[in-house]
């Protein structure tokens, strides 16, 4: 099957299940399975993909249709340009937290402070 058609079909399934980020999710999942960046998908959209990739992709899309977060499906979440491994045992980093870290670092830019991270997630705040 052709890559762009595979993504389009999966995106439509997700859209019909009221998943707002349907195209983004479809692209993130297939790029993770193929171990390529999302830009690769745009540059190679007429590429034929193997049956094994399609099977893995279909399984992952079924998980997303059940509203499982993309981060759990792909096993990672980006935070401050760093990929952090995530699973159901850790909270997924949220964009709001990224903004909070940015604002705190800007506010205390020239001040010495102590911060305690009590480990409720994947460690992204501490490491970022």
Regions found by a protein language model. Give the residues of each.
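A general structural signal for well-ordered alpha-helical segments in protein cores
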Residues: 7, 26-27, 57, 70, ...
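Secondary-structure boundary/capping motif
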Residues: 7, 38, 112-114
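Generic leucine side-chain signal with a strong bias for well-ordered alpha-helical environments
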Residues: 14, 24, 41, 91, ...
């Amino acid at each position: 099957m052709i890559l762009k058609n595979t993504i389009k079909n999966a995106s439509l399934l997700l859209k019909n299940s009221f998943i707002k980020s349907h195209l983004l999710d479809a692209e993130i999942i297939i790029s993770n399975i193929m171990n390529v960046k999302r830009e690769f998908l745009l540059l190679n959209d007429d590429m034929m993909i193997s049956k094994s990739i399609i099977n893995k992709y279909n399984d992952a899309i079924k998980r997303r249709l059940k509203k499982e977060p993309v981060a759990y499906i792909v096993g990672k979440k980006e935070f401050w340009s760093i990929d952090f491994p995530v699973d159901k045992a850790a909270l997924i980093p949220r964009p709001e937290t990224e903004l909070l870290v940015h604002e705190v670092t800007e506010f205390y830019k020239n001040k010495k402070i102590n911060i305690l991270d009590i480990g409720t997630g994947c460690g992204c705040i501490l490491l970022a």
